[in-house]
UniProtKB/Swiss-Prot annotation:
Residues 346-562 are annotated as: B. Homodimer. Gene3D superfamilies: 3.30.230.80, 3.40.50.11260, Heat shock protein 90, C-terminal domain (1.20.120.790), Histidine kinase-like ATPase, C-terminal domain (3.30.565.10). The keyword Lipid biosynthesis does not apply. Keywords: ATP-binding, Chaperone, Cytoplasm, Nucleotide-binding, Stress response. It is found in: Cytoplasm. Residues 1-345 are annotated as: A. Pfam families: HATPase_c_3 (PF13589), HSP90 (PF00183). One of its GO terms (molecular function) is ATP hydrolysis activity. GO terms for cellular component: cytoplasm. InterPro entries: HATPase_C_sf, Heat_shock_protein_90_CS, HSP90_C, Hsp90_fam, Hsp90_N, Ribosomal_Su5_D2-typ_SF. This is Chaperone protein HtpG.
Length: 637
């Protein structure tokens, strides 16, 4: 009795199918790469499960992928004898996209084919790529260890629905038949298929086979009889684990194709490192830095990590124990000789071998990035534009490598006059003034706010470089990166400016004299502002602006307050220190005011101006506007 059911595709699948058919038409042949990749993964999974249950092989342990074509019928079939799927598995895997953040992914699509094709490639189209060339797809599958009459038939024309039925299938594994569109019949040509397999599948460790027709008995050139040969399945790829081959034998093209196989990205990697480690631990790693950030890089639920193999046997995807979170963009694999074949995620968590390997792999990636930064600054900037903000998590997460990570960071600076983050901390150190002991920086809400901050006035006048930080993560970074190569990082908006030897004796004396002369004014402003400020001081950092606000040492900065508020965290009240510039005409005029009410209004106006300049917002903007209008009106009379 038939058990056929019709199911509707998940909404996102419909969207993906439509977009894929229209966006990936220039790279149609990737359907074969994706389907062969999936078939090879199914073989890897069976090999892993059979470690504890040999019966799953059902007497056939020679794992392989077979590809055949029928020109007359216009079909291509990809068949594997891997792990196979149950009915529930078919409905789940071939009817939905089981990825977190899928809705967000679709929001990122622009409708522009070239941009969308890049995003779709990063998303990983997998099985659905079949519909790029097929008007109908038929899947016959039986899960390893299940009875022949528990096999499943899945069919769809890629529109809105698919059918599922129960069938009988003698052999385990999955067979996918593509019924090609009329305009895609070129893919039913065996030579075309062979060229694609050679291009995309040489690195796959499972044999990929195509049928080689036999030949009849025939006469040779000298009249001798050449015996008939039987047809056979011919292996079309090298079928050895690429990472176990000698580096000198592997071409750049093979490395790039392997990257696409394991990452399901279809843009080239930026760089890679293939390394064999011998000693206390023996393992091979092949690590890739992608050229583009994945669309869901900031999604907390996103799986990341390396593929783990033990003695060439695939164990698991996304083994995040080998890679710190701030390097979560790294793709690749690790093949260990020391871990047990029955290793689990729990065992990996607290394993001394894992920890040693993680340390080694982290150093390897940092070394790759250091070499890239030294050898190819332009390419490093490309990396930084994609992954720089993630790398900034490093100093907080990885104390042991904090200095190395800091050396890889890039910032905008007053030296370049550009918003582009191209300045390293070593660049900064090389340009420090004689007698300078600190690395000066400012964190603001935008590059413009940082570059135009009044806190930079004296430093600009003296030609002292300041790093300009304006990313959300910068305040977090700077809380964990307090020094670099024995030079303290010092905020120009916090506490005293502390120029040390950069300020000569005459300047210090003049500053002290000005502060002494302005003491009565400072006291009047303190009285006028009352509890709204922590303190009032004469500034040592302003030259052209009447006043500014400064965060006290040990107090939370305005940027950190915003981060905490955005995360829904309670924030303590922080009162600023108000610094005035007595040399500015507005402040000297303020000093002459005898009307205490007007004095208080002007003092408040200067304070709120300074707060607006520092934070970009005010707690009560309406009160500020009202005060502004009142002052303007008074001066227009």
């Amino acid at each position: 009795m038939s058990q056929q059911e019709t199911h509707g595709f998940q909404t996102e699948v419909k969207q993906l199918l439509h977009l894929m058919i229209h966006s990936l038409y220039s790279n149609k042949e990737i359907f074969l790469r994706e389907l062969v990749s999936n078939a090879a993964d199914a073989a890897d999974k069976l090999r892993y499960l059979a470690l504890t249950n040999d019966a799953l092989y059902e007497g056939d342990g020679e794992l392989r992928v077979r590809i055949s074509a029928d020109k007359e019928k216009g079909t291509v079939t990809i068949e594997d004898n891997g792990v196979g799927m149950t009915r529930d598995g078919v409905i789940e895997h071939l009817g939905t996209i089981a990825k977190s953040g899928t809705a967000e992914f679709f929001k990122n699509l622009s409708g522009e084919a070239s941009k969308d094709s890049q995003l779709i490639g990063q998303f990983g189209v997998g099985f659905y790529s079949a519909f790029i060339v097929a008007k109908k797809v038929t899947v016959r599958t039986r899960a390893a260890g299940h009875k022949a009459n528990e096999a499943v038939l899945w069919e769809s024309e890629g529109e809105g629905s698919f059918t599922v039925d129960t069938i009988t299938k003698a052999s385990r594994g999955t067979e996918i038949t593509l019924h090609l569109r009329d305009e895609e019949k070129e893919f039913a040509d065996e030579w075309r298929l062979r060229s694609i397999i050679t291009k995309y599948s040489d690195h796959i460790s499972v044999p990929v086979e195509m049928w080689q027709e036999g030949t009849p008995e025939r006469d040779g050139p000298d009249g001798e009889k050449i015996p008939a040969t039987e047809g056979y399945w011919k292996v079309m790829n090298k079928a050895t684990a690429l990472w176990m081959r000698n580096k000198s034998e592997i071409s750049d093209e093979e490395y790039q194709e392997f990257y696409k196989h394991i990452s399901h990205d279809y843009t080239d990697a930026l760089l890679w490192s293939h390394n064999r480690v011998e000693g206390k631990q023996e393992y091979t790693n092949l690590l890739y830095i992608p050229s583009k950030a994945p669309w869901d890089l900031w999604n907390r639920d996103r799986k990341h990590g390396l593929k783990l193999f033990v003695q060439r046997v695939f164990i698991m995807d996304d083994a995040e124990q080998f890679m710190p979170s701030y390097l979560r963009f790294v793709q690749g694999l690790i093949d260990s000789n020391d871990l047990p074949l029955n290793v689990s995620r729990e065992i990996l968590q607290d394993n001394h071998i894992t920890k040693a390997m993680r340390t080694g792999i982290t150093k390897r990636v940092l070394g790759m990035l250091e070499k890239l930064a030294k050898d190819d600054a332009e390419k490093y900037q490309q990396f930084w534009a994609e992954f720089g903000q993630v790398l900034k998590e490093g100093p907080a997460e990885d104390f042991a490598n904090r200095e190395r990570i800091a050396g890889l960071l890039r910032f905008a600076s007053t030296h370049t006059g550009s918003a582009a983050p191209t300045v390293s901390l070593d660049d900064y150190l090389s340009r420090m003034k004689e007698g300078q002991t600190k690395i000066y920086y400012i964190v603001a809400d935008s590059h413009e706010a940082a570059a135009n901050s009044p806190h930079l006035e004296l430093l600009r006048k003296k030609g002292i470089e300041v790093l300009l930080m304006s990313e959300r993560i910068d305040e977090w970074l700077i809380n964990h990166l307090t020094e670099y190569k024995e030079k303290q990082l010092h905020s120009v908006t916090r506490g005293e400016l502390e120029l040390g030897e950069l300020e000569d004796a005459a300047e210090k004396e003049a500053q002290e004299k000005l502060a002494e002369e302005s003491a009565p004014l400072v006291e009047r402003i303190k009285a006028a502002l009352g509890a709204s400020v922590a303190d009032v001081k004469v500034t040592s950092r302003l030259t052209d602006t009447p006043a500014c606000v400064v965060t006290g040492e040990g107090e939370m900065s305005s940027q950190m307050i915003k981060l905490m508020q955005a995360a829904g965290q309670p924030v303590p009240e922080v009162k600023p220190t108000f610094e005035i510039n007595p040399a500015h005409p507005l402040v000297s005029r303020l000093n002459d005011l005898q009307d205490e009410a007007a004095f208080a209004d002007w003092s408040n106006l200067l304070l709120q101006q300074a707060q607006l300049s520092e934070k970009g917002s005010l707690a009560d903007p309406s009160a500020f506007i009202k005060l502004m209008n009142q002052m303007l009106l008074a001066n227009l009379k």
